[in-house]
Amino acid sequence: MSFAEKITGLLARPNQDPAGGPEAPWYLKYGSRVLGIVAAFFAILFGLWNVLSIIGLSVSCLVAGIIQMLAGFVVMALEAPCCFVCIEQVGSVADKVDAKPMYFRAGLYCAMAVPPIFMCFGLASLFGSGLIFATGAVYGMMALGKKASATDMRAAAQQSGYGGNATTSTTNDRAGIVNNAQPFSFTGAVGTDSNV
C-alpha cells in the first residue's frame, strides 16, 4: 500500500457505522469529526498551559494538564489518525473504535473530559476539556438517532393515551377532581369567627 492510498483510506471514513446503526445526517458526521480535531488541538494547547502552572506550585493543575494533553492526543488519534502516520498501531485502534457503537465514543470522550475540569478549574481546563465534552455530546446525539416523523409520533401518542385524544373519554365534568374533595360553595356569605 502506497503512502497516498494510506492517507486516502484514513481520511475517507468519517464515522461509518458498519453495524448499521442509526443513520446520522452528513453535517453531524463531518461536524463531529471537525469538532473533535479542533477540540483535540485546543485540549493539547491548553493542557500545556496548565502544565506550565507548575511555576505557581500547583500540582493538581500539573496533573490536570497532563491528563488533558493525553485526552487531546487520544481524541486526535481517533478522529484524525492521519496525524499519526508514523505510529502503525493508531490506524488499527481507530478502526476498532470506529467499529464500536457511537455511544461508546460519546462515553469515552465525556469521561476523559471531566477529570481535568474538576482537578484544576480554570478557563484553560474548562475550554480545552469542554470542547472534548461537546464532541462527546455530539456523538451521543448521533447515537440516539433521528427523531421519528410527525405521523409516527402522533400514532404513538394516540396508542398510549397521551396527547388529549384518549380512547376512554369520560362524560363526568368532575373527573379530574380528587376523590372526596368538596367543590367550592359561593351561595352564602363568609362566616366570621368571633372567638378570636
From Swiss-Prot:
Keyword tags: Calcium, Calcium channel, Calcium transport, Cell membrane, Cell projection, Cytoplasmic vesicle, Endocytosis, Endosome, Ion channel, Ion transport, Membrane, Synapse, Transmembrane, Transmembrane helix, Transport
Listed GO MF terms: calcium channel activity; identical protein binding
A Pfam family annotated for this UniProt entry: Cg6151-P
GO biological process terms, semicolon-separated: bulk synaptic vesicle endocytosis; cell competition in a multicellular organism; clathrin-dependent synaptic vesicle endocytosis; photoreceptor cell differentiation; positive regulation of neuron apoptotic process; positive regulation of presynaptic cytosolic calcium concentration; synaptic vesicle endocytosis
Activation/inhibition comment: Channel activity is inhibited by La(3+), which reduces Ca(2+) influx and thus inhibits it's function in promoting activity-dependent bulk endocytosis (ADBE) in response to high stimuli.
Signal peptide range: none
Annotated site residues (Calcium ion selectivity) in this chain: E79
Localization in the cell: Cell membrane; Cytoplasmic vesicle, Secretory vesicle, Synaptic vesicle membrane; Presynaptic cell membrane; Endosome
Chain segments annotated as transmembrane: 35-55, 70-92, 113-133
Domain of life assignment: Eukaryota
SMART domains linked: Cg6151-P
Major subcellular location class: membrane
Assembly information from the UniProt record: Homomultimer. Associates with the dally/ magu complex.
Function per UniProt: Transmembrane protein which mediates synaptic endocytosis, fitness-based cell culling, neuronal culling, morphogen gradient scaling, and calcium transport. Regulates synaptic endocytosis and hence couples exo- with endocytosis. Controls two major modes of synaptic vesicle (SV) endocytosis in the synaptic boutons of neuromuscular junctions (NMJs); Ca(2+) channel-independent Clathrin-mediated endocytosis (CME) in response to mild stimulation, and Ca(2+) channel-dependent activity-dependent bulk endocytosis (ADBE) in response to strong stimulation.
Family: Belongs to the calcium channel flower family.
Official protein name in the record: Calcium channel flower
Gene that produces this protein: flower
